[in-house]
C-alpha cells in the first residue's frame, strides 16, 4: 500500500489498485532516477521490511548513467533463504578485461530482524563504502589498487519489495500477504569538499 499527499504517488497507487484485479500480487518500487543522485556522503534509511518466503525487500543503488565499469550497491537485501534475523549487504563490480566481461560480488550477511525498524546507513567515500546498522559497523568495502572502482560517479536510490525471482529461490508462500515496507525517513548528508 502506498500513501502520500503527492499527486504522483496517488496516480501510482491507483495503477497498483487496477493491477490487483489481474494478478495475484504486484511487486513495487520507488526510485530517485532523474530526481536525486548521490555521490560521496552519508545515506540513512529508517525502515522495517516484510518477511516471508518469496518476499524480497531491498534498498539499493545503481549508476545514474550507464557504462563500464558498472557498480551496484546493495545497502539491505533480504530473502527467506536466510533467517528472518539476517539480511545481505553486497557490492557488485562489473568490468571488462581483455574483452571479457567480468563481474565480482562481495556479499556480507548481517544479523538483524528486518521486520523491526532499523537505521541502515551507507557512508560513501572516494576510496571506500562503509555500511552500518543502527550506528554499528557491519561491513567496509575498500578500493583496491589495479581493480575497477565504479563508485566515483553519481548513483540513484531504489527501494523495492519484490515477490519471486531470485527472492523466491528458496520457495514462495503467499500467506505473508498483504505485506508492506514501512519507511520512516531517508536522510542524505553530502561530504564537504
Q: What is each PLM-predicted segment?
A:
Residues 112-115, 130-181, 191:
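Aromatic sugar-binding interfaces of carbohydrate-active proteins
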Residues 13-86:
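Secretory/extracellular carbohydrate-interaction modules
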Residues 184-188:
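Extracellular beta-strand elements of beta-rich domains used
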Residues 30-35, 105-111, 146:
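Beta-strand-rich interaction surfaces with strong enrichment in secreted/lumenal proteins
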Residues 43-45, 117-124, 129-131:
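Short tryptophan-centered beta-strand motifs in secreted/extracellular beta-sheet-rich domains
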Residues 1-12:
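Single conserved hydrophobic/aromatic residue that forms the stacking wall/gate
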Residues 68-116, 168:
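Glycine-aromatic-enriched beta-strand/loop faces of beta-sandwich-type recognition domains
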Residues 9, 36-39, 66-69, 113, ...:
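Extracellular/periplasmic catalytic domains that process cell-envelope and extracellular macromolecules
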Amino acid at each position: 500500500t502506498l500513501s502520500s499527499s503527492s499527486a504522483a504517488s496517488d496516480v501510482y497507487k491507483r495503477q497498483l489498485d487496477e493491477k490487483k484485479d489481474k494478478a495475484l500480487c504486484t511487486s513495487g518500487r520507488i526510485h530517485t532516477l532523474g530526481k536525486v543522485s548521490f555521490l560521496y556522503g552519508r545515506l540513512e534509511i529508517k525502515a522495517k521490511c516484510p518477511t516471508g518466503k518469496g518476499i524480497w525487500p531491498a534498498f539499493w543503488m545503481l549508476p545514474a548513467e550507464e557504462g563500464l565499469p558498472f557498480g551496484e550497491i546493495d545497502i539491505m537485501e533480504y530473502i527467506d533463504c536466510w533467517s528472518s534475523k539476517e539480511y545481505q549487504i553486497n557490492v557488485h563490480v562489473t568490468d571488462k578485461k581483455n574483452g571479457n566481461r567480468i563481474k565480482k560480488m562481495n556479499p556480507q550477511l548481517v544479523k538483524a530482524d528486518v521486520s523491526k525498524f532499523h537505521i541502515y546507513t551507507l557512508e560513501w567515500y572516494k576510496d571506500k563504502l562503509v555500511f552500518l546498522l543502527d550506528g554499528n559497523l557491519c561491513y567496509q568495502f575498500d578500493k583496491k589498487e589495479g581493480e575497477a572502482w565504479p563508485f566515483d560517479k553519481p548513483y540513484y536510490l531504489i527501494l523495492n519489495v519484490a515477490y519471486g525471482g531470485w527472492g523466491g529461490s528458496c520457495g514462495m508462500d503467499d500467506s505473508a500477504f498483504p505485506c508492506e515496507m514501512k519507511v520512516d525517513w531517508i536522510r542524505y548528508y553530502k561530504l564537504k569538499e
